[in-house]
């Protein structure tokens, strides 16, 4: 929500840069490159908020995500869907549509949490809280 309300043209350019490279990384199956671009995208979105607390939270979350990347738990077949979702988030922010941006980001986060739970269940055989 804050990203859509506060994003400047310069902020949007920083969000669009990794987003523009994500489709090629997804298409060619370059998982590490895609995940690095994903981290850059989310950091740029956090910077759009101009809220240091949210930026710091994103930095901390990036550290956790990097651990997941090293474990290789992102399936290649999810990348194309991810590109589309990220593009929708960017478009909502660029339109300064805070309601859509917040809804899309919440759905994105919820999807990530559900995916992580499924991975944990598949790897450890029990449902995670």
Where are these regions (language model features)?
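C-terminal effector-binding regulatory domain of bacterial HTH transcription factors
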Residues: 98-129
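Short alpha-helix boundary/capping motifs
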Residues: 73-74, 85-86, 93, 117-121, ...
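Structural signature of alpha-solenoid helical repeat scaffolds
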Residues: 29, 74-77
């Amino acid at each position: 929500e804050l990203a859509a309300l506060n994003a400047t043209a310069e902020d949007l350019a920083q969000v669009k840069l990794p987003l523009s490279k994500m489709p090629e990384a997804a298409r060619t199956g370059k998982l590490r490159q895609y995940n690095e671009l994903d981290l850059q995208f989310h950091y740029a979105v956090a910077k759009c908020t101009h809220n240091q607390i949210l930026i710091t939270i994103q930095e901390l979350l990036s550290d956790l995500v990097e651990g997941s990347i090293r474990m290789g738990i992102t399936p290649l077949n999810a990348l194309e869907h991810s590109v589309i979702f990220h593009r929708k988030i960017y478009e909502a922010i660029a339109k300064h549509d805070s309601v859509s941006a917040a809804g899309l980001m919440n759905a994105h986060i919820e999807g990530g949490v559900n995916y992580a739970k499924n991975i944990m269940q598949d790897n450890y055989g029990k449902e995670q809280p």
